[in-house]
């Protein structure tokens, strides 16, 4: 799994020019699902996401997580995170999970995240969406569950 985590003041997802989901202060998460992902990657990613201390404490130091801040989380699936642009002029998506597998893992990810964080909203899997947000900081991190083996 590849997660692009952005600390935001607000974020919205529109589908067909209609507001689908919106959050206030919290995290905007773009979620890419790799063809090798499974429940182990989901559990690790969810745990890391909800406990990552990227919100400022009273001293301005990144020392609080999204749960401690009572922040919201907006999750948007994005298979293009696994696009390979190194060869040719058109990206290939060989590393991305196929849509049926990705949908199942996406749903599992959301279910596990909702167990850990009370304020979770989503985009619509597979839909053409317009996403807008206001970064806070900006603070942005890229986290890949398969990379944890390198740590």
Curated annotation (Swiss-Prot):
GO terms for molecular function: D-tyrosyl-tRNA(Tyr) deacylase activity; Gly-tRNA(Ala) deacylase activity; Ser(Gly)-tRNA(Ala) hydrolase activity; tRNA binding. GO terms for biological process: D-amino acid catabolic process. A motif (Gly-cisPro motif, important for rejection of L-amino acids) lies at residues 137-138. One of its GO terms (cellular component) is cytoplasm. Coiled coil: none annotated. It catalyses: glycyl-tRNA(Ala) + H2O = tRNA(Ala) + glycine + H(+); a D-aminoacyl-tRNA + H2O = a tRNA + a D-alpha-amino acid + H(+). It is an enzyme of class 3 (hydrolase). Its EC number is 3.1.1.96. It is found in: Cytoplasm. It comes from the Bacteria. The keyword Membrane does not apply. Keywords: Cytoplasm, Hydrolase, RNA-binding, tRNA-binding. InterPro entries: Daa-tRNA_deacyls_DTD (IPR003732), DTD-like_sf (IPR023509). A Gly-cisPro motif from one monomer fits into the active site of the other monomer to allow specific chiral rejection of L-amino acids. Homodimer. An aminoacyl-tRNA editing enzyme that deacylates mischarged D-aminoacyl-tRNAs. Also deacylates mischarged glycyl-tRNA(Ala), protecting cells against glycine mischarging by AlaRS. Acts via tRNA-based rather than protein-based catalysis; rejects L-amino acids rather than detecting D-amino acids in the active site. By recycling D-aminoacyl-tRNA to D-amino acids and free tRNA molecules, this enzyme counteracts the toxicity associated with the formation of D-aminoacyl-tRNA entities in vivo and helps enforce protein L-homochirality. Belongs to the DTD family. This is D-aminoacyl-tRNA deacylase. It comes from Protochlamydia amoebophila (strain UWE25).
